[in-house]
Amino acid sequence: NDIVAAYDPNTAGRFLVVCKDEANGSSGKAIVGNVTGTSISFGPEVTFNAGSTSYLAMSFDPNTADKFVVTYMDWSNSGVGTAVVGSISGTNVITFGAKTVFNAGANLTYRNSIAFYPNTANKFILVHQGGKAHIGTVTGTSVSFSPEVTFTAGTAGYSRIVADPYT
């Protein structure tokens, strides 16, 4: 996916759009949107990856206000799977932490998907086409990953992950 959007579960009327900007070298951009009544307004575009970006996924942490994680393939870094923590402050101000590589095998992170644990702050699960899964941990503005675990020996095409809200 080259554009994803999600509502912020912690702030009424706020959502985030993450996309690649094909007019600017396919760089990765994020934009906060706000819905008020029947009107939509947007903040400024913020770049999280200046190089060629694709296969985006994004999720808000339902337990930590204003925090989200974006994952993507970074073609400006040999196509590695990369993650970055974002924060929203005020109405539309987005800041990003440092980028973290979660899979250094180029072309193995197509179609990744992430989901935060619904009852544990700062923890999420990431799966990707390589048939691998990781647990991600957000600390401040950085993210770290557990060693990857294989969940299928084949190619896991369009993987999607959801977290069990009862655990």
Question: What residue spans do the PLM features occupy?
Answer:
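Extracellular, repeat-based ectodomains that mediate carbohydrate processing or recognition
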Residues: 1-167
